[in-house]
Amino acid sequence: MVTEKKTKKSHEGINSRLALVMKSGKYTLGYKSVLKSLRGSKGKLILISTNCPPLRRSEIEYYAMLAKVGVHHYNGNNVDLGTACGKYFRVSCLSIVDPGDSDIIKSIPGDQ
């Protein structure tokens, strides 16, 4: 029960930092634009939802490894990630290009 509280609190922390990135930073949403930002080495952090297809996930992780960018597996499905971004559509993956006023890159180093 204690671990459930901790994960919920960290989940809320990620959501609030993500909302701040959406307001003050630069980001790209979607698979193709995430790969473009990784190939151009513009992305600083990649977030992937839990129900992103395995082939896409492994390809994003591979490009992120080549670009030395952190990858965070978001603890929710693509509907949850879209809602956390303040969008009314599903988001399977997103790349943070410029965090703006948020400290999301320091707080989430990535799962590498």
From Swiss-Prot:
GO terms for molecular function: mRNA binding; structural constituent of ribosome. Keywords: Ribonucleoprotein, Ribosomal protein. It comes from the Eukaryota. This is Large ribosomal subunit protein eL30y. InterPro entries: Ribosomal_eL30-like, Ribosomal_eL30-like_sf, Ribosomal_eL30_CS, Ribosomal_eL8/eL30/eS12/Gad45. GO terms for cellular component: cytosolic large ribosomal subunit; cytosolic ribosome; mitochondrion. Disulfide bonds: none annotated. Belongs to the eukaryotic ribosomal protein eL30 family. Signal peptide: none annotated.
